[in-house]
Curated annotation (Swiss-Prot):
<dbReference type="InterPro" id="IPR011639">
    <property type="entry name" value="MethylTrfase_TaqI-like_dom"/>
</dbReference>
<keyword id="KW-0238">DNA-binding</keyword>
<keyword id="KW-0489">Methyltransferase</keyword>
<keyword id="KW-0680">Restriction system</keyword>
<protein>
    <recommendedName>
        <fullName>Type II methyltransferase M.SalI</fullName>
        <ecNumber>2.1.1.72</ecNumber>
    </recommendedName>
</protein>
<dbReference type="GO" id="GO:0032259">
    <property type="term" value="P:methylation"/>
</dbReference>
<dbReference type="InterPro" id="IPR036625">
    <property type="entry name" value="E3-bd_dom_sf"/>
</dbReference>
<keyword id="KW-0949">S-adenosyl-L-methionine</keyword>
<dbReference type="InterPro" id="IPR029063">
    <property type="entry name" value="SAM-dependent_MTases_sf"/>
</dbReference>
<dbReference type="GO" id="GO:0003677">
    <property type="term" value="F:DNA binding"/>
</dbReference>
<keyword id="KW-0808">Transferase</keyword>
<dbReference type="InterPro" id="IPR055370">
    <property type="entry name" value="Lsr2_DNA-bd"/>
</dbReference>
<comment type="similarity">
    <text>Belongs to the N(4)/N(6)-methyltransferase family.</text>
</comment>
<dbReference type="Pfam" id="PF23359">
    <property type="entry name" value="Lsr2_DNA-bd"/>
</dbReference>
<dbReference type="GO" id="GO:0016746">
    <property type="term" value="F:acyltransferase activity"/>
</dbReference>
<comment type="function">
    <text>A gamma subtype methylase that recognizes the double-stranded sequence 5'-GTCGAC-3', methylates A-5 on both strands, and protects the DNA from cleavage by the SalI endonuclease.</text>
</comment>
<dbReference type="InterPro" id="IPR050953">
    <property type="entry name" value="N4_N6_ade-DNA_methylase"/>
</dbReference>
């Protein structure tokens, strides 16, 4: 059996290479076809078989491809025996290949969609191992997504997000095919631990089954040559979580020799939390993951940088713009790629442009083309060189005129949107911007809230102290707050940045912390004594409108609206005059 399995595996590898070459990378990406390397398949199978306590195995491999995991099963059986083995594959080329290779070894290959409710009836599997298709949601049809979501909700009472990748539905819809206490192992992207659409899978792992282990491979050691994703192995048993049970979270190295290992009580696993923190150990399990102290959102409004629609066309060297004769009032200073900024601070020259070797200009003009021809023929001539690809782009085609950019003020603080960094090296950089330059969407732009603006207004040098406090945020906090992709690429979204702790800023001045508590203290429970009156949201909303402040018809009011109300009513019976022990919530 071993020699036959080795010979079949050698044929499989050659066939896999041939079949992969028949499709372009884009086509394989749309199918989610990323073959499991044989060494990785063997490592996963050895670990999983050891968890299978019964001698007889009923094996199921969803999206079996050419049969990499079945091949690994044959090579690592030991004293166990295969009673039944089923592989499911949608691609007819691979289903035929797997059938030709492995039917003689006991694998029954079913050609079809694994998520189809009628394809396989269950429960059939005591052992399931899979590398499901990594198909992103935008490659799934609307009706297909609606059907998948509905069946997950019907079978498990769990409703996934429409942004979920196909792999998430594979895991959830496999539940009906698992025997009691079956071992189920999945090689899937690590993103589910951190993104919002991974909540459904985390709910399943935390509440419906007994999670055994999640091992996240080091992002710098990409497991697939043709897929820039960070991979994790997720292992669970089909049995309810037991009181006192702990799950193993490990990182880096291999399954048998990880770099880091943590035991996390199942009771501590909440679907809403970022589970990558358990993997890396950034956030111990006994700490409440809900941030209760000051957050960056208390001090900054965070927005993505400008999306021009075509940086190569709309952003040109300032010297080139001046050589062409483009007037200065149609040029806005804009920062280059983060790679070209060596320090953590950008100073300004006498004109307000960033003091860097190559200054870049963003072309921005509100005039219609007929007026522009008269006002600045040189700019009109340059714009006439835009090809149809630029003019027909989504962002450009929605603008009027098409060369007018989004209006954005320079931000005093920037964060690089993506970056790399291991151990204590920060993957992302906070940059102080003393110039008049705006930034592209390679950055996040941090604008001080009214609360922080009041502090900064007292001394122009205070922005340096705020920047220093941001630089003190640890590399671990940045990694724990963001997400990581294959090759060690880290990314931070605005909401993730907003949720990072900001104690370092709050401690710069006692007034800052007091102002935060004034708008964030939870309401006191009612007691026998009456509470001092405070303004209702409707009262503040009415006052704001009467004073020309734009506020929404319903929902939470922005903190700066409350700030403005308090300043206008200083000395009256307002929450500012209530003793600290009797403060009430303002929003």
């Amino acid at each position: 059996m071993h020699s036959e399995a080795r010979e079949a595996e050698a044929r499989r590898l050659l066939l896999q290479e041939t079949l992969d070459a028949e499709r372009t990378f884009l086509e394989r990406n749309q199918w989610g076809q990323f073959a499991t390397p044989p060494s990785l398949a063997g490592e996963i199978m050895r670990y999983t078989i050891d968890l299978h306590e019964e001698t007889r195995i009923n094996f199921l491999e969803p999206s079996c491809g050419s049969g990499s995991f079945f091949s690994a099963l044959l090579r690592n059986l030991g004293d166990k025996k295969i009673e039944h083995a089923v592989g499911v594959e949608l691609d007819p080329r691979f289903s035929k290949a797997a059938s030709d290779l492995w039917t003689g070894q006991g694998l029954r290959v079913i050609e079809g969609d694994f998520t189809s409710p009628s394809l396989v009836s269950g429960p059939v599997a005591s052992l399931l191992v899979a590398n499901p298709p990594y198909v992103r949601h935008h490659h799934l049809g609307i009706d297909q997504k609606r059907d998948l979501v509905a069946r997950c909700a019907d079978q498990l009472g769990i409703k996934p997000s429409g942004l979920s990748g196909l792999y998430l539905y594979f895991v959830l819809l496999s539940h009906r095919l698992l025997r009691a206490d079956a071992v189920s192992t999945w090689l899937i992207p690590s993103e589910f631990m951190d993104v919002n659409y991974g909540t459904a899978l985390k709910e399943y792992l935390a509440t419906r089954v007994q999670l055994v282990r999640i091992h996240q491979y080091d992002a710098a050691e990409v497991q697939f040559d043709d897929a820039l994703v960070t991979s994790s192995v997720v292992v669970f048993r089909n049995s309810p979580p037991r009181p006192g049970h702990t799950a193993e979270f490990s990182f880096g190295g291999t399954l048998s020799e990880p770099k880091v290992t943590h035991q996390i009580p199942s009771a501590a696993l909440t679907p809403e939390a970022k589970w990558s923190r358990y993997v890396t150990g950034v956030m111990p399990a006994d700490i409440n993951l809900k941030q209760t102290g000051p957050k960056l959102s208390d001090f900054f409004k965070i927005r993505r940088g400008l999306a021009t629609g075509s940086n190569a066309f709309f952003i040109i060297p300032r010297s080139e713009a001046e050589r062409l004769g483009i007037k200065r009032n149609f040029l806005r200073p804009i920062l280059p790629s983060p790679r070209k900024l060596k320090g953590d601070a950008i100073t300004a020259d006498a004109s307000g442009w960033p003091d860097i070797p190559e200054q870049l200009a963003l072309l921005d003009c509100p005039l219609p083309i007929e007026d522009l021809l008269l006002e600045n023929p040189a700019l009109a001539a340059y714009l006439s060189t835009a090809d149809e690809k630029i003019r027909g782009g989504y962002l450009v085609s929605k603008r009027s005129p098409w060369y007018k950019q989004e209006q954005r003020e320079p931000a005093p603080i920037l964060l690089t949107y993506m970056g790399r960094g291991k151990d204590d090296q920060h993957p992302l950089r906070f940059i102080r911007n003393d110039s008049d330059a705006v930034a592209t969407n390679m950055y996040l732009m941090l604008y001080p809230t009214a609360l922080l603006q009041r502090y900064l207004a007292g001394d122009p040098e205070r922005i340096k102290q705020v920047h220093k406090a941001l630089l003190a945020i640890t590399a671990a906090d940045l990694r724990g707050g963001g997400r990581v992709y294959g090759g060690g690429l880290h990314k931070m979204e605005p909401k993730e940045l907003a949720a990072l702790p900001a104690d370092g800023i709050a401690t710069l001045d006692p007034v800052l912390r007091e102002d935060i508590s004034m708008v964030s203290v939870p309401p006191r429970k009612r007691t026998g004594r009456p509470q001092m009156p405070g303004p209702s949201a409707s009262e503040v909303r009415a006052w704001a409108r009467a004073n020309g402040v734009c506020v929404p018809d319903r929902g939470r009011l922005r903190p700066e609206v409350w700030d403005a109300w308090r300043q206008a009513h200083a000395g009256e019976a307002s929450p500012l005059n209530i003793d600290a022990g009797d403060q009430v919530a303002l929003w």
